[in-house]
């Protein structure tokens, strides 16, 4: 249930800005303006009766502020009809001149608003996106099309790779034709210039190679930094969400031949392998022990020897993989290749949880005779809330001395009260280590010197005392080396900090300075930042949740916090992502919505070379949108207890204000999460609105991300309380709308969303929500993992009342709903089936029977085994249709019908 995280390369970055108040836009079709200016333009164009052609170069322009049904909707405000009388020519000229003046002023004001600490009520602001304009003539999307890739945007993964001699703008391409090479490195600019002297470097000519008669087919590849050898993974098998095992090989580029990573154990499965920055060695973990293979020898060096069932070296256990690092590695090379840092994880005291498989046998072993009828059981070391955690400590390996050592840090947390959440190598043998206490509300930043083998805490932050919140694990801290020629006298680092109630960027220098230079501030919050750094020019760039939390835009700022510049076109309400080449001369810009996604590689403004190449336009989706009828999306805010909460309302095609529509609320709602996003997405909710004809509403309530820490942290210690009240209040707002049938309102969610669906209908007691659907729900936070749960709830020993309140336990209230549905995979290693089974037991004990249940044998949290994923959504859709058709009312208080019984009896020749 870990929130989605993303990291960024530690390589040097450059900005994407060209000068004051500029953004990079290939079409040059829009000038920089605030959203308020765009709103005015939309209104003026509507008065004039004009329309916008939102082609690829004008994505999302102009049509976000009014709806296609002629309603300029400010909640229940009057609307301006699209067929109004045209404005006279003189009025147009005056309005145009006034608009020009306003745009000029707003251009300067926008950045000041965005990062100037301005806070305003957004309750009545409404934005609409309608990407399909076929009306009633279009084709309806089907449920199969939602999941078979019909509506999935094509997306190219650009893998930037550093050049062995400092070259910038190099791409690693896999899967090219045999004539061009299966794996190759190519200069992004020269590949479009046939006269260029920069030729591609072919690393692997073919898509496979042979080693001693064994054909090796790569599933993942990692070129060495000098591009002379490729580390290859084959025979990959999934472990948990992020981890996998396989056979590893070393492929020599010059000879085009391969060899096992460990020639003495070529068939043994390896958990993790990574290159030395010097390209002369590979460190790897096998059977939870670490080894080093130097390319100068066929022998491997044992770094550790006592790894096994309870001791992990270099790889995380289940809970650290899921909740802290969101990855399969806890191994870090120093930049000079002299040292390796790694975590040792001791699970000796962690209780086991058995996951049973009734149909499949994931371990691949054939049971002994007589054992075929018994399920396979996989025991996981899984620390539930309040249970013993794994003990994790940081260790180091001196490559030259072949020695493992650790460094004590005075004043650090006790072993049982420590979570290590990030490790970043600095220069001259120094390491930055971020750790928290068990409940994740006190942060320590330590600096370790591996040369002197000393360490000290350089920064402490009590987040609980600051705002009652917590520390979210992240791996985005960026080391900034000293560079006196460019004004940096000391080493430092950039981190995300809490400033004036928001997540902002800060620069700490020297490296042991506890007081930062705050780089960003104001209304918006940075997202997984920093995204990159231009060391030469002293610039940081980052992604920000823009003027509206559902947007993503890219900005840059100087190391001293001055010259905040937009990179993307902030006058358009858009959702962007970006990655940069290792020298930051080029950027891979990804537009994700609200219109059809596209991808481009562009040169950055600091680059002397001007370059732009469209990588993907998704023309197939543009064509499909001309054929199909999709829902319209209304983005707006509602005010609940003084908080402006983002809402997405999906309306069916040909929406009619005079009709009464059923409403389905869809949510996730986990702490720091976000579901209301302006991304192109045709999903199950689209199917419900566009095919079934229901309204779908999503509310990012209190506790979710990018609406300020005050709204986020209020939920701590009492998960589900404020979040469910927000959903109930929102449902009451929608129930009062003239186009909503208040007797047909339902809610559904998966995982944390499943918990929220149950908690909401429990709190509501059938007064507003009549139906609910929960997939893989947590029903008692005592059953979920410790690191995630205690971050938001403290321990059960410290907060027993909070855990009692958060549990789904009021069966009397649940009995007042018409009906609800629970679905769960029996092999869920994340949210255990224990949650649903104990919940159903409570219902049985209290004689509650207004529910349905569906278990999926051997499916994990994603519910895919044996066609299960399709069945989940088919069942969900059918159940929902039956609910809104009133079928479940017939089961609410069933009574015999004599006429039906008589007809049935005649079919079998009986008499009654």
Curated annotation (Swiss-Prot):
One of its GO terms (molecular function) is dipeptidyl-peptidase activity. One of its GO terms (cellular component) is fungal-type vacuole membrane. It is found in: Vacuole membrane. Residues 7-25, 54-67 have a biased composition (Basic and acidic residues). It holds the Pfam family DPPIV_N. Residues 114-912 are vacuolar. Residues 1-92 are cytoplasmic. GO terms for biological process: proteolysis. The keyword Membrane applies. It is a single-pass type II membrane protein. The chain crosses the membrane at residues 93-113. Glycans are attached at residues 130, 210, 346, 569, 656, 810, 897. It catalyses: Release of an N-terminal dipeptide, Xaa-Yaa-|-Zaa-, from a polypeptide, preferentially when Yaa is Pro, provided Zaa is neither Pro nor hydroxyproline. Residues 1-30, 48-68 are annotated as: Disordered. It comes from the Eukaryota. Keywords: Aminopeptidase, Glycoprotein, Hydrolase, Membrane, Protease, Serine protease, Signal-anchor, Transmembrane, Transmembrane helix, Vacuole. The active site is at 751 (charge relay system), 828 (charge relay system), 861 (charge relay system). Its main location: membrane. Belongs to the peptidase S9B family. Type IV dipeptidyl-peptidase which removes N-terminal dipeptides sequentially from polypeptides having unsubstituted N-termini provided that the penultimate residue is proline. This is Probable dipeptidyl-aminopeptidase B. The lineage of its organism: Eukaryota, Fungi, Dikarya, Ascomycota, Pezizomycotina. The gene is DAPB.
């Amino acid at each position: 249930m870990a929130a989605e995280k993303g990291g960024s390369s530690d390589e040097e970055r450059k900005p994407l800005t060209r000068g004051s108040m500029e953004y990079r836009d290939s079409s040059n079709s829009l000038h920089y303006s605030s959203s308020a200016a765009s709103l005015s333009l939309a209104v003026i164009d509507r008065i004039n009766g004009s329309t916008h052609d939102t082609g690829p170069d004008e994505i999302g322009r102009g049509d976000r502020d009014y709806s296609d049904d002629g309603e300029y909707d400010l909640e229940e405000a009057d609307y301006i009809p699209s067929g109004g009388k045209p404005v006279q020519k003189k009025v147009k000229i005056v309005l145009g001149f006034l608009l020009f003046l306003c745009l000029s002023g707003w251009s300067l004001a926008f950045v000041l608003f965005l990062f100037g600490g301005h806070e305003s009520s957004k309750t009545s602001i409404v934005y609409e996106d309608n990407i399909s304009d076929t009306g009633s003539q279009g084709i309806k999307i089907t449920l199969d099309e939602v999941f078979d890739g019909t509506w999935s945007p094509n997306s190219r993964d650009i893998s930037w790779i550093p050049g062995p001699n400092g070259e910038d703008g190099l791409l690693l391409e896999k899967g090219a034709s045999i004539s061009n090479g299966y794996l190759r490195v190519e200069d992004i600019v020269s590949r479009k210039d046939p006269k260029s002297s920069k030729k591609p470097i072919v690393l692997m000519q073919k898509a496979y190679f042979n080693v001693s008669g064994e054909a090796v087919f790569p599933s993942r590849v990692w070129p060495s930094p000098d591009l002379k050898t490729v580390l290859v993974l084959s025979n990959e098998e999934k472990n948990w969400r992020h981890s996998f095992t396989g056979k590893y090989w070393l492929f020599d580029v010059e000879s085009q031949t391969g060899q096992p990573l460990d020639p003495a154990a070529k068939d043994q499965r390896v958990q993790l392998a990574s290159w030395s920055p010097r390209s002369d060695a590979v460190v790897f973990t096998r059977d939870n022990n670490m080894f080093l293979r130097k390319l100068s020898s066929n022998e491997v060096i044992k770094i550790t020897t006592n790894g096994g069932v309870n001791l992990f070296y270099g790889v995380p256990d289940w809970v650290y993989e899921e909740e802290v690092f969101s990855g399969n590695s806890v191994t870090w090379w120093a930049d000079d290749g002299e040292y390796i840092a790694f975590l040792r994880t001791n699970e000796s005291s962690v209780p086991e949880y058995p996951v049973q498989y009734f149909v499949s046998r994931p371990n691949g072993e054939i049971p002994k005779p007589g054992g075929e009828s018994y399920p396979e059981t996989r025991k996981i070391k899984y620390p539930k809330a309040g249970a013993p955690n794994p003990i994790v400590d940081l260790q180091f390996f001196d490559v030259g001395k072949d020695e493992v050592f650790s460094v004590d840090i005075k004043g650090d947390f006790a072993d049982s009260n420590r979570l290590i959440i990030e490790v970043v190598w600095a220069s001259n043998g120094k390491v930055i280590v971020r750790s928290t206490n068990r409940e994740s509300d006190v942060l320590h930043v330590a600096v370790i010197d591996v040369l002197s083998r000393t360490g000290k805490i350089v920064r402490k932050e009590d987040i609980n005392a600051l705002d009652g919140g917590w520390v979210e694990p992240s791996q985005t801290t960026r080391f900034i080396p000293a560079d006196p020629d460019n004004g940096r006298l000391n080493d430092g680092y950039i981190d995300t900090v809490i400033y004036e109630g928001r997540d902002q960027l800060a620069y700490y220098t020297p490296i042991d300075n506890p007081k930062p230079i705050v780089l960003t501030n104001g209304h918006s919050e940075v997202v997984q930042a920093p995204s990159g750094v231009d060391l030469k020019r002293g610039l940081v760039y980052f992604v920000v949740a823009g003027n509206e939390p559902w947007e993503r835009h890219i900005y840059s700022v100087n190391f001293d916090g001055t010259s905040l510049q937009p990179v993307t076109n902030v006058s358009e309400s858009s959702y962007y992502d970006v990655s940069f080449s290792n020298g930051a001369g080029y950027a891979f810009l990804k537009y994700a919505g609200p219109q059809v996604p596209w991808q481009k590689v562009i040169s950055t403004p600091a680059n002397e070379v001007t370059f732009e190449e469209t990588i993907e336009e998704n023309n197939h989706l543009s064509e499909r949108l001309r054929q199909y009828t999709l829902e319209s999306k209304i983005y707006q805010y509602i005010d609940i207890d003084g908080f402006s909460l983002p809402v997405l309302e999906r309306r069916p095609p040909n929406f009619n204000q005079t009709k009464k529509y059923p409403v389905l609320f869809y949510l996730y709602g986990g702490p720091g999460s976000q579901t209301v996003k302006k991304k192109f997405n045709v999903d199950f909710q689209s199917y419900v609105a566009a095919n079934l004809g229901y309204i779908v509403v999503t509310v990012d309530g209190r506790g979710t991300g990018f609406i300020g820490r005050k709204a986020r942290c209020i939920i701590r210690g009492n998960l589900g309380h404020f979040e469910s009240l927000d959903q109930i209040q929102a449902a009451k707002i929608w129930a009062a709308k003239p186009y909503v049938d208040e007797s047909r309102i339902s809610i559904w969610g998966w995982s944390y969303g499943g918990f929220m669906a149950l908690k909401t209908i429990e709190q509501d007691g059938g007064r507003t929500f009549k139906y609910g659907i929960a997939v893989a729900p947590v029903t008692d936070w005592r059953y979920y993992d410790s690191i995630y749960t205690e971050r938001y709830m403290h321990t059960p020993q410290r907060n027993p009342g909070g855990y009692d309140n958060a549990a789904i336990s009021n069966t009397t209230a649940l009995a007042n709903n018409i009906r609800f549905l629970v679905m769960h995979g029996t092999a869920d290693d994340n949210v255990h089936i224990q949650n649903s089974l104990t919940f159903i037991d409570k219902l049985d004990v209290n004689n509650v029977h207004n529910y349905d249940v569906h278990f999926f044998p051997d499916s994990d949290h994603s519910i895919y085994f044996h066609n299960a994923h399709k069945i989940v959504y088919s069942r969900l859709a059918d159940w929902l249709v039956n609910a809104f058709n009133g079928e479940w009312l017939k089961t609410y208080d069933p009574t015999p019908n004599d006429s039906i019984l008589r007809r049935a009896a005649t079919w079998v020749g009986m008499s009654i």
